[in-house]
Regions:
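Short linear motifs embedded in intrinsically disordered, charge-biased segments
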Residues: 1-178
Length: 178
């Protein structure tokens, strides 16, 4: 059907499996430093959850499902009950974590930079700039990857001059970090 919903469901299921497979008390150890817990979580659970996210064009509903899973994991890791009045904003502040949406945005822009620096004859670069000759259907057309990237560039304030900035890898990297 052209949506990412089934892929998102699979990613959440796989990441949930990784989280559940962690040794029972790895995240429950109070003496373990917050930074260590977050590094383990990032290297294992988030890596599985966001695998391939640089190519996703997801809906707001899919983003909400990913955010919800991420917040549930963080709450579990730090022993924060859902009954406690602790907002998701407070949770991100405590854990110094970005939203999943901004992580996906960063991944998409990183991939854009990688492809833009490729030689012209490389297939990913050729495909990025290929236009299909068929018209898009009217009404309710789905957002394309290119549309997501345009939104990401606007959100990062990189609408103007990004095509020159992208050629300077270090500057592009620091400009696109959420």
């Amino acid at each position: 059907d052209g949506t990412m919903t089934s892929e998102i469901s699979a990613r959440i299921a796989k990441a949930g499996g990784v989280f559940a497979a962690m040794p029972r008390n790895v995240f429950a150890i109070r003496a373990m430093a917050k930074s260590v817990k977050l590094r383990v979580y990032s290297a294992s659970v988030l890596a599985v959850l966001l695998y391939g996210s640089e190519t996703w064009n997801i809906t707001a509903a899919d983003t909400k499902r990913l955010e919800s899973f991420h917040n549930r994991c963080l709450r579990c890791m730090f022993g924060i009950s859902r009954l406690t009045h602790f907002t998701n904003f407070d949770l991100r502040k405590l854990t110094d974590q970005q939203t999943i949406e901004s992580k996906i945005m960063t991944n998409r822009l990183r991939w854009l930079g990688h492809v833009m620096r490729m030689p012209e004859e490389r297939m990913p670069k050729r495909m990025m700039f290929t236009r299909l000759q068929t018209a898009r259907p009217q009404g309710g057309t789905r957002q394309r990857w290119k549309d997501c990237v345009q939104h990401d560039l606007r959100a990062m304030g990189l609408e103007d001059g990004w095509s020159h900035l992208v050629q300077q890898r270090d500057k592009w990297h620091s400009a696109t970090q959420g």
